[in-house]
């Protein structure tokens, strides 16, 4: 938080030094790097739940300050954006300006009732995805060891396992994302959708445009396009 507001105050005062921008980025990325290095060596040097997503959010804000997309920001709004708990562990990754607009919006009773109803529906659908469908596919995903049977039987078993595991991953992850969306809606935050029927994709690129969309969009906006 401190380095982000230090960069913001520098940009507002006209002190647009590139080294400050780079230092701010390094400061927010460093804890994640230390945590990942510790994980490799099985040492919990510096880690906590949701550190990756907090890092992505902080990087996003710093880049948008540099690009003049954010000219002013309330400290409370920024902290709320970073630690908003419903998508804390696995996303979806929201955008700070969109999130802040929702957080500061005053809903009428009827508007909030509609939002709450949609949130509850998303929670229920997400629970079915994760707890029912995900469990079913996980139960039937039984990796078959390679044996001495005919090659086509072995190949068929491996293909079946690959499909079962793919569907299990989808329903487990998409179910969590839907529940995170639903809980967010109940708090008045319209967290964006994370999956859009990826198994109906026409090619590999289309698949990744439909799978974990907020993460792929984040990399596209803040990594690939700037490079």
Tell me the role of every PLM-derived stretch:
Residues 1-227:
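Membrane-embedded transmembrane alpha-helical bundles that form the catalytic cores
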């Amino acid at each position: 938080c401190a380095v982000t507001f230090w960069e913001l105050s520098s940009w507002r005062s006209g002190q647009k030094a590139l080294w400050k921008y780079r230092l701010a980025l390094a400061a927010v990325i460093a804890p994640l790097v230390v945590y990942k290095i510790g994980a490799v060596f099985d040492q919990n040097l510096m880690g906590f739940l949701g550190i990756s997503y907090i890092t992505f959010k902080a990087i996003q804000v710093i880049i948008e300050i540099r690009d003049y997309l954010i000219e002013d920001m309330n400290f409370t709004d920024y902290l709320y954006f970073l630690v908003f708990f419903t998508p804390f562990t696995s996303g979806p990754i929201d955008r700070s300006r969109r999130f802040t607009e929702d957080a500061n919006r005053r809903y009428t009773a009827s508007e909030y009732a509609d939002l709450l109803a949609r949130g509850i529906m998303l929670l229920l659908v997400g629970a079915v995805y994760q707890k029912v469908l995900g469990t079913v596919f996980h139960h039937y995903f039984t990796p078959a060891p390679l044996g001495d049977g005919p090659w086509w039987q072995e190949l068929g078993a491996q293909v079946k396992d690959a499909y079962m595991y793919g569907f299990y991953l989808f329903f487990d992850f998409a179910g969590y994302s839907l529940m995170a969306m639903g809980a967010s809606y109940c708090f008045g935050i319209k967290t964006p959708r994370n999956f859009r029927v990826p198994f109906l994709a026409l090619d590999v690129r289309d698949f990744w445009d439909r799978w974990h969309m907020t993460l792929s969009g984040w990399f596209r906006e803040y990594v690939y396009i700037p490079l």
